[in-house]
């Protein structure tokens, strides 16, 4: 049932047709989803971590610098990892669309820096692609584009790249969402209308 599977509000399930999707598959451990972000709680009991890397601090611990705080929870990266691949039917947290998929956690923010910014996007994307990512999720962005990152993405035609449109309610194209071969994703509300904060332009999904 949808209750035991744990995904939240009914409209969210209907919007993405999660019930129909779950009837087809609950995901596969053969699929590796890379989360490029400010850290992923690597011992979270609702996530299966396949590999992890802190490309900013050059170590193999992708956990956030501040492991948990009341306002930020388990970090933005952990939140994104849960949406992508939280386990299904385990009585914990939410259920994602592909709960059997495994996470490649890539921390691209130095522990000494502001946890709200991504500093090493290129290195994070490259490491994820070199270490088995089938999907690369990038929930960050700015108006600055990089030819080097575009070329890097082009070098991995078999990888699906997904990026956030941004949360500033502007039509400005943000990157990495604006790169070629990247699926840019905006936000909608409970009425399937653009969320008040979501960036918007013709290239978004």
What are these regions (language model features)?
Residues 137-139, 162-166, 185:
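Active-site neighborhood of phospho(di)ester-bond hydrolases with catalytic His/Asp-centered motifs
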Residues 42, 143-145, 168-172:
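Active-site environment of divalent metal-dependent phosphoester hydrolases
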Residues 4-5, 9-135, 154, 161, ...:
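Active-site core segment of subtilase-fold serine proteases
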Residues 109, 139-141, 188:
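Conserved residues at the C-terminal ends of beta-strands
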Residues 45, 149-150, 170-177:
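Distinct, well-ordered alpha-helical segments
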Residues 37, 47, 158, 174-205:
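Extracellular S/T/G-rich loop segment that most often corresponds to the catalytic His/Ser-adjacent loop
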Residues 38, 166-167:
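Active-site metal-binding loops of divalent metal-dependent hydrolases
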Residues 145-161:
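Catalytic-core regions built around general acid/base machinery
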């Amino acid at each position: 049932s949808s209750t035991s599977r744990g995904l939240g509000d009914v409209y969210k399930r209907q919007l993405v047709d999660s019930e129909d999707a779950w009837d087809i598959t609950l995901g596969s451990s053969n699929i590796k989803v890379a989360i490029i972000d400010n850290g992923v709680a690597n011992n979270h009991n609702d996530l299966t971590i396949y590999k992890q890397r802190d490309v900013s601090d050059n170590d193999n611990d992708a956990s956030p610098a501040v492991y948990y705080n009341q306002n930020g929870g388990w970090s933005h990266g952990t939140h994104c990892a849960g949406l992508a691949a939280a386990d299904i039917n385990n009585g914990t947290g939410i259920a994602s669309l592909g709960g059997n998929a495994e996470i490649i956690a890539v921390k691209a923010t130095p522990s000494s820096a502001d946890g709200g910014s991504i500093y090493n996007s290129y290195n994070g994307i490259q490491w994820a692609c070199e270490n088995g990512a089938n999907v690369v999720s990038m929930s960050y962005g700015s108006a600055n584009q990089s030819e080097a990152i575009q070329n890097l993405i082009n070098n991995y035609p078999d990888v699906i790249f997904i990026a956030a449109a941004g949360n500033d309610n502007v039509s400005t194209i943000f990157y990495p969402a604006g790169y070629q071969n990247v699926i840019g994703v905006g936000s909608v509300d409970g009425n399937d209308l653009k969320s008040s904060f979501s960036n918007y332009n013709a290239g978004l999904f």
